[in-house]
């Protein structure tokens, strides 16, 4: 009997032992940092878990068998790995994740001046990494922004191709451009603030659509673009990115990291762009796009200090020689009336820095300064401008219970001088010198785990216009981990400088009339934002973000092109202006590596005066963007298909006889790129831009009016100053460069390579 009992115990023990289950554990990281809240699961089973705050995970009691482990985390590429589970085996499996352009968990600073996860911020901030911009390589960030929903680079001149950035249909001057959070990009230099920074040195770009005046001052009326440069500590030892197009546009980006002693790290960047081909495919005798010779040097230092306190300082210098005009123009014709040309020399220097004061409290001193010199000739019209801006700010960051406080004092000095009437008084030179001291306070209150309220107030004193008060309120409701609602509202105040903001005021093609003493513009804005995250069991991720926005302007300054075709009349609107609409972005990440980013904006912009509503020139009502990417793993080839589409825009005509179309057509700019990454440290890429070969001249006899007589020597006027139609001038036109809404560059190929040594 004892033998039978012993045998039964032995059999039961061995049966239980053979059925003993095993475990799977490990560490999920990215760039040597743990990734929290990543989903770890065995596909097709009930075994699933999430990583903790340090990136660790563990799944227990797994039965024997073959499984496929999948890791899914917001903002990172999905990973899969086959495993075989055997009895009585504890498997340790670590994963290293790579970033994707879905950056919902990205840390942002632009919304509140504090480093916070994007999903935790009460202010909606869009984040774009270099991965996003590499899908359609460009020579400047200005051009790259054409792939961002609701953001449109707008050319302002068909000859020299200067432009600005429109956010949600608002003109460029309503957008504040920052570098590392510093407002060093002035109205004279918006385009140059987005040119000359090597893409390899950009950590990310943050975009806030809507009011940000309570933190950044009165210029942030329509939104802001904050270019965050790399921390030298995390930058690669050496990086290079070189590409050229079939138009022989050549761009070179170089970056080098240097360790100086034991406590300092420097990052040196060089950007060089050259295009010197006088191409005239539209046969109007003028260059299709402007020629440019631009070089930019950038250096950033970071210093190691006690208690991990911050100290960074950066400097940048830019020089550009830009030309557009008659293909027969030479340097000797600059400023003369034999052959028309627009020649712009630009010199620019910038200095920015942040220093955390050595106190127990978190006190941050930030400073920036820039000088910008522009020497231009628009035909015989000379425009020579000099602008200097200094900025100093001290902030105190303090948490008290449920209150996360940020308060600060700031002062900004703006010196502006040019050779126009804008800076002359009684026949003598009178440079514009503006002081703008201010104080602000912001309190982000955590009402509950799911509800946050942000209150902000800023007071500035403009030495010309007196007191400026800009309040702000934001509310965030986190319904759950996958659904977030934000409501933001605020006001704005902006002083306009016509000669730095409106290129048409400089060309000399039309006479400038300022009807009255222009008052500063004021605005009030509201924005409702909703984020939805959808995670599927198979690893598919869908992110949806929708915003409703409304801005109402008073004292808006409008340009009247219609009253007199030979004049531009500027005046404050006798009424109000509205900018409103809806914008949606949708991200798709599929387990097979397919990624789709798409967005669309429906815009309604109107000037309301004396009960009459008018849509401003060059303002689209609908725009959409997309990016489709797929990597063929077997051959290390990545395919990127990007594009955008714009609805018709009203365009300025010179007269009733003007044969050009009063509206632009629906048009789309589409691109494709192939990137090979099979060699260590190297990437080779090639593709085609403007696949549909769209050109704005399509269905138009010409774009630039009277290129055969740019100095209007053969124009005949009546006694009232109106242009007469003559056999030589059958449409009664004068020389005009303002009829431009898109790039005048057709289909073209490109090829480039990248080298990165970490």
Language-model features and meaning:
Residues 27-33, 37-43, 72-76, 86, ...:
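Short, acidic, small-residue-rich periplasmic hinge/interaction motif at the N-terminus
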Residues 91-95, 141-144, 163-166, 192-198, ...:
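N-terminal periplasmic accessory domains that precede
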Residues 263, 364-376, 478, 486, ...:
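Membrane-embedded beta-barrel scaffold of Gram-negative outer-membrane proteins
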Residues 275-296, 302-363, 369-388:
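Flexible loop and strand-edge segments within Gram-negative outer membrane beta-barrel domains
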Residues 142-183, 203:
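Extracytoplasmic beta-strand/coil segments of soluble accessory domains associated
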Residues 446-450, 543-552, 572-653, 754-756:
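Gram-negative outer-membrane beta-barrel transporters
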Residues 60-61, 166, 182-209, 297, ...:
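Short acidic/polar hinge/loop motifs at secondary-structure boundaries
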Residues 645-652, 676-758:
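C-terminal beta-signal and adjacent terminal beta-strands/loops
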């Amino acid at each position: 009997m004892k033998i039978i009992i012993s045998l039964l115990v032995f059999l039961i023990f061995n049966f239980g032992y053979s059925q003993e289950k095993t475990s799977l554990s490990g560490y999920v990281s990215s760039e040597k940092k743990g990734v929290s809240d990543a989903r770890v699961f065995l596909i097709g089973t009930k075994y699933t878990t999430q990583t903790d705050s340090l990136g660790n995970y563990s799944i227990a009691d797994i039965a024997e068998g073959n499984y496929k482990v999948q890791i899914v985390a917001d903002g990172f590429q999905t990973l899969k790995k086959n495993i075989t589970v055997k009895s009585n085996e504890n498997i340790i499996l670590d994963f290293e994740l790579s970033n994707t352009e879905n950056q919902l968990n990205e840390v942002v600073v632009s919304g509140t001046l504090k480093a916070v996860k994007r999903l935790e911020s009460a202010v909606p901030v869009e984040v774009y990494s270099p991965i996003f911009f590499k899908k359609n390589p460009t020579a400047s960030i200005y051009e790259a922004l054409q792939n961002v929903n609701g953001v449109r680079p707008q050319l302002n001149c068909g000859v020299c191709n200067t432009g600005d950035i429109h956010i949600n249909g608002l003109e460029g001057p309503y957008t504040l451009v920052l570098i590392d959070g510093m407002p060093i990009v002035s109205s004279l230099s918006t385009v140059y603030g987005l040119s000359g920074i090597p893409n390899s040195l950009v950590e990310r770009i943050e975009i806030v659509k809507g009011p940000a005046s309570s933190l950044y001052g009165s210029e942030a009326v329509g939104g802001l673009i904050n270019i965050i440069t790399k921390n030298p500590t995390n930058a690669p030892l050496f990086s290079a990115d070189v590409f050229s197009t079939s138009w022989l546009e050549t761009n070179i980006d170089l970056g080098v990291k240097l360790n100086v002693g034991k406590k300092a790290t420097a990052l040196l960047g060089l950007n060089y762009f050259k295009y010197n081909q006088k191409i005239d495919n539209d046969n109007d005798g003028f260059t299709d796009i402007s020629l440019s010779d631009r070089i930019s040097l950038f250096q950033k230092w970071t210093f190691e200090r006690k208690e991990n306190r911050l100290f960074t300082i950066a400097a940048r210098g830019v020089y550009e020689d830009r030309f557009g005009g008659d293909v027969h123009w030479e340097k000797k014709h600059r400023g003369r009336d034999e052959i028309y040309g627009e020649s712009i020399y630009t010199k620019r220097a910038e200095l920015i820095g942040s220093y955390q004061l050595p106190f127990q409290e978190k006190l941050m001193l930030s400073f920036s300064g820039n000088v910008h010199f522009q020497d231009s000739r628009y035909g015989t019209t000379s425009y020579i401008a000099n602008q200097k801006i200094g900025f100093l700010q001290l902030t105190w960051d303090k948490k008290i219970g449920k209150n996360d406080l940020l308060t600060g004092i700031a002062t900004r000095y703006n010196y502006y001088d040019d050779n126009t009437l804008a800076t002359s008084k009684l026949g003598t030179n009178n440079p514009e010198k503006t002081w703008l001291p201010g104080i602000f306070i912001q309190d982000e209150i955590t009402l509950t785990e799911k509800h946050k309220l942000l209150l902000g107030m800023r007071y500035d004193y403009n030495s010309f216009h007196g007191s400026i008060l800009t309040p702000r309120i934001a509310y965030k409701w986190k319904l759950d981990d996958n659904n977030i609602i934000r409501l933001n509202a605020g006001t704005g105040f902006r002083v306009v400088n016509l000669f730095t903001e409106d290129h048409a005021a400089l060309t000399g093609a039309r006479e400038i009339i300022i009807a009255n003493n222009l008052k500063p513009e004021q605005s009030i804005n509201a924005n409702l934002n909703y984020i939805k995250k959808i995670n599927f069991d198979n690893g598919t991720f869908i992110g949806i973000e929708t915003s409703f926005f409304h801005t109402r302007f008073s004292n808006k300054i409008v340009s009247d092109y219609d009253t007199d075709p030979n004049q531009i009349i500027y005046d404050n609107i006798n009424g109000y202006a509205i900018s409103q609409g809806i914008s949606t972005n949708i991200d798709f990440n599929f387990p097979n590596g397919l990624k789709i980013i798409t967005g669309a904006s429906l815009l309604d912009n109107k000037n309301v005066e004396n009960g009459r509503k008018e849509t401003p020139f060059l303002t689209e009502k609908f725009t959409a963007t997309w990016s489709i990417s797929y990597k063929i793993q077997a051959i290390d080839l990545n395919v990127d298909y990007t594009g955008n589409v714009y609805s018709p825009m009203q365009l300025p005509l010179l007269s009733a006889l003007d044969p050009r179309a009063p509206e632009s057509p629906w048009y789309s700019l589409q691109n494709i790129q192939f990137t090979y990454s099979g060699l260590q440290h190297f990437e080779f890429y090639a593709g085609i831009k403007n696949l549909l070969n769209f050109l704005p001249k399509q269905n138009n006899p010409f774009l630039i009016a009277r290129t055969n007589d740019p100095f209007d020597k053969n124009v005949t006027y009546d006694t009232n100053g109106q242009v007469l139609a003559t056999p030589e001038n059958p449409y009664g036109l004068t020389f005009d460069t303002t009829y431009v809404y898109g790039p005048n560059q057709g289909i073209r190929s490109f090829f480039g390579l990248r080298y990165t040594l970490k």
